[in-house]
Amino acid sequence: SNAVKTFSVPGQNIIYADINGNIGWRPAVKIPIRKNAKNLLPRPGEDSSYDWEGFVPFNEMPFLLNPEKGFIATANNKTIGDSFPYYISNQWASPSRIKRIEQMIMDRMFTNVDFMQEMQMDQKSHLALEIVNHLLQTKSNGNELINKGHSILSEWDFIESPDSKGALVYHYIFNALLKNTYG
């Protein structure tokens, strides 16, 4: 845990185990102390009231030690609660990757090199699983193309392999939803 004090790069999470059987997590970053930082608007550079006021002290940084669930995983997801008093970011990855990792670990509750390789190569999309269930509830109104899409999605195993018809249909619809929703 103390080794992280001297290692800091943007967005790095360190998960460790020690010789006493402890497992832990620490962010290996220097978090600047910033006033009014909880949004993405640019700040006027000539106004010193927005200057950084140093960095969050190591002993006030978030950490995790020996969680009850028995393992620690991160996947660029939000790793801190809303009660953490310093602003880190409001740009976190979707929780779908961490949910998938946690699901795989919980299903096995053991690890070895082969299992770690399997997790690294896993192509199952937790996000697609959530979204496709909603898409399949939509009505086609007799549209042949929509019926074909429904059929492909209803048979899809949520594996996003390069040759997957289900992945192609899902991403086409998902991108159209984003474009039609946000422009």
Residue ranges and their predicted role:
Residues 18-183:
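Long, compositionally biased non-active-site segments enriched in small/hydrophobic residues and glycine
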